[in-house]
Amino acid sequence: MPKPTTLRTTQDDARENQQIAKFGLAAREGRSNKYTPDADLLCEGAQYEVELKTSDVAKKQISTARGVTFKKIEEWRKVQVWIFSQYERPNRLTGENYVLFPEQMEPYYKKLEDKIQKGTKKRAGLDDWNYAKSALVAIGFDNTVLNKLDYAFNHKGCALNDPKIPWSYVATNGTRVSSAAELREIVKRYYSRQGFTNREQCL
C-alpha cells in the first residue's frame, strides 16, 4: 500500500493538490519513470486507485501523457477511478468535477489504440510499419537492423504525443461529483453493481 500523503511537492501539482484535498484522497508520493496512478481512494475498507486530470475551462480538453503506446493504455485500463476537474488560470478549480470508471473510459482507449495501429492521414501506424517490414524481409534486409527498427516502431515510433481528451467526452460519459462523500457513494454504488467488494477484485 502506498504511504498516504495529502500534499504533492512540485508547483505543477497545485491543481492535483486541490483535487486531493477536496475529495479526501491519499496522494501517491512523487513521480517516477514508472507509471503509477496519482492517488488512492479509501472507502469502507476498500482501496481504489485514482487518476487525476484537469482541464483549462477555456481550452476544453485534457492533456494525458507523452509517448502513449499500447503499454500505457493497458496501464490506464487498470485504473479504477478517474476524476476530472475544470480550472481557470492559473490554478483555481471551478467546481465542475466528473468521475469516470473503466467502462466509460474504454471507448477512448479503443480510439487511441486504433490510431496507433492504423495511423492517421499524416502519420504512420503499426499496420504501415508491418507492411514495410514484410517488404524488407522479402528483399533480405539485415535482420539485426530490422529487429531494431521493429522495436523502435512498436515502442516509440508509433506512440501518440499527448493525445487529448475532449471535455465534452468527460461531461457526456461521466458522473458529476461535488464532494468527498458524494464521490465515495458513487464509487461504492458502481463497484457494487460490478460485483466487486475490494480493491484486489477490481484489478
Segments from the language model and where they lie:
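Nucleic-acid endonuclease domains
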Residues: 1-37, 42-203
